Amino acid sequence: RFVSAIGEELSHGEAAALSWEVYFVLRGLPAMGMDFDLGKYFKSDELNALWACEDLGHYLKRSASTLSTEPADVAVALLQDLISTADAAAEGKADATVQLRFGHAETLMPLLSLMHLRGCYYLTNYFDTVALHWRDFDIVPMAANLQMVLFKTAKGRVYVRFALNERAVPLMPDSDDTVIPWSVARNYLLR
């Protein structure tokens, strides 16, 4: 719709390139507080196709895939630091009761993939299905965050709860439990 509204004859490649450029500019306007309707320029199926292509790019660049685990592997040092910090807290050796780290989507996506959190880790050879199972806007919306909260019982047992974007998420692939013993979580994360 957008390209035909210009009124010029464009090759398929020119039309695709122009659509991408306009999409990349316009999609960011609402995040800047500008009230804007992308539907004015693109049909919903066109918008979905453009987003799915962008989503696939994020998936291939920042998550484990059947092509490479390298995007997730870059987060190994961060995960090891999270584990050692949690170990110190569990053993009562941490000076702080809260540890905060700040990063961007480009930091969180690899970490979440490495941790195999549900919805953040998806392997397939059918890349046209990625947008059905791995959605960047669910994984790292604006102000995305991962919480790892440790609890210690009166008997000294330590449990952990993970929350992604303020929602409790199970860590273990075969369980819906959102609070699990730290030792179980630790062993799983070190696999």
Language model: regions and residue ranges:
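Signature for phosphate-centric chemistry
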Residues: 1-99, 103-191
